[in-house]
Amino acid sequence: QVSSAASDVYKRQVLFLLGILYYGVDDDGQQFRYLGVLQRIAVCYLFGGLLFLNFRWRGLLLSSVLLLGSYWALMSFVEVPGHGAANWEVGTNLAHYIDTQYLGGYKWSGDWDPEGLLSTMPAIVSGILGIFGGMLLKNPNLTGSMRAIWILAIGGACLGGGYWWDAYASLDYN
């Protein structure tokens, strides 16, 4: 399992470096973009893969709940220096503050970047949801129709949960 973890890390490093090579430098060649889509995929794939190698489905579920709960708590309760109380508004929230203070380089759109540091937490959970889907599809104890029923039921529950959760933590991409 050590070689599998080492291989997992190596593949993600290559993907991260490809993202830096592709997205890394602005048009003037003066500033560097540290995080982009490929880098985000590499980070999520790395953490998801390492969690998958070390935990069963309950550990993955607990990791997902902890990541989303921590993200929500940070965004909802941590005061943003220079902007006052915690908020979810683009440009004044904690994720933007952390990216501005610690990420450096140029951003995707002015002073904002959708692939930031703090916002990677829920993105990792999206990767873990994909792992759950793969685990369900590869389960030898389920027939094809039972897999379809489970996927529809879980998808419906996630949609309902997301609709309910939107009242507490809005889903903003822009």
Language model region names:
Residues 1-6, 10:
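Single conserved hydrophobic/aromatic residue that forms the stacking wall/gate
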Residues 15-24, 68-77, 156-166:
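Aromatic-anchored segments of alpha-helical transmembrane domains
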Residues 24-34, 82, 167-174:
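Membrane-interface helix caps and helix-loop-helix hairpins in membrane proteins
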Residues 34-46, 121-129:
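Membrane-embedded alpha-helical segments of multi-pass membrane proteins
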Residues 55-65, 142-150:
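Membrane-interfacial entry segments at the cytosolic side of transmembrane helices
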Residues 132-174:
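Long, well-ordered mid-to-C-terminal structural blocks that present hydrophobic/aromatic surfaces
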